[in-house]
């Protein structure tokens, strides 16, 4: 009872007129109904708390889920910019299905079958194994293409949001971009990301781009770190009052 429970919520989307307040409030009521103190944290910020620990919590965190992608620009543990876009893994599946005439369920199955696809190989290379049918080849090429489109969409919006933000801190050193979520776990993802990333057009110098370790659970671990920090601060506050 009265322990801290941190739960993640998406940041406000920039490409769709919708809010997340209702869902946040529903989650809060459920959690508090079990006797916990509910504390929300934005999804990409939670990812940053796990993936940017070795860089003084400074850098860019991108959480790529099925329905949305969340982005946070962090400086010394503080969020300088957060937003989301309403595209993710489902968007890839839907567009590949529309272009190839294959069902969305089958596209998802092919995309998540590690032995079938490697995005690190170019479209003109053999990204599929021997015995792959023509239909499956078309699906695999379309998956790679739409991964590139999604990543480009993320980077373009990040650049626009960064340049339009007020009071953005100066970053004295090159920063990492860390990525988490199920949509980034396909083999060869980083290769496609690097193809779309253009340092000359990006607003700050980037020293590395990597997928966070244990990507599926990274956000949960970030939520736990935030909960422990809140409890520690509350304990210190109580000790100060007693003195």
PLM feature segments, named:
Residues 1-61, 76-83, 89, 94-149, ...:
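Nucleotide/phosphate-binding catalytic cleft detector across ATP-hydrolyzing
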Residues 46, 66-67:
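Short, glycine/acidic-enriched loop or turn micro-motifs at the edges of active sites
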